Amino acid sequence: MWILAHVIIAPNSMYLQTRVHGSAGRKMDAAFATLPSDDTVRDKTLVVLQAPNDFTSYYFTLMRSGDALPLPEHTRVLSTGLHPMTIERPGANRLVLRTTDGFIAQRDLSIYRNHKYPMQTGETISITGMTAVVTKADIHGWPMDAVFTFDKSLDDESILWYIGTMAPERNPKTGRKLKVERYFPVPVPAVGETLSIDDLLARSEKYKMAVAAAEAPG
């Protein structure tokens, strides 16, 4: 039994885990390659309005650091999951985000908040350069709507606005069209505007180029 477990099963299991983790790592590398990586980001704040999953901020920082690549001075992921969300800009430095399913995608596995620590309407979180106030929470204490106030105008060049989504892309080897995690720069809404995630992506030149490339004949 010891030989079966340690000589036969364990090495094969380790090989399988390495392949799985390697594949996942390559996918994340490709996704994070669409986030800014030149030296100019070192004094910038990267704001991801929505990321496809809860692990973006953690793995992005970990992988960039491991590869000795430039990191933004601050990274703020405001919501995760591919859920409908509206973004209202009532003032120069303020956003109101409203969701249908909350700000956290994988609630059971979330690295952001444990379900044992529910949030309340009116709860305030302040971090460098930004304050978030929960304006609506569900019965389980998960935030649904929130106001984000920054310490400078949202139009300031030091703030980089991005959205993560599952974008269409053709496999370069097979020509097959896939949905892959990618990040796109988006213009921040104008004061007085209320837009959806799809509205903002539709204003992104890079997103439009990616969609057009995926739709082009192979």
Each model region followed by its residue ranges:
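Short, solvent-exposed secondary-structure boundary/capping segments
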Residues: D138-D151
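Short, surface-exposed beta-strand/loop "edge" segments at domain boundaries and coil↔beta transitions
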Residues: P52-T61, D101-I111, A132-V133, S153-L160
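Membrane-embedded, lumen/periplasm-facing catalytic core of multi-pass transferases
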Residues: W2-S79, F184-P189, T194-L200, S204-K208, ...
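Short coil-to-beta-strand transition motifs
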Residues: E123-V133
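Short, cationic low-complexity segments
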Residues: D155-L195
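Luminal/periplasmic acceptor-recognition loop/helix of membrane-associated glycosyltransferases
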Residues: G66-N114
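Short, solvent-exposed mixed-charge patches
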Residues: A216-G218
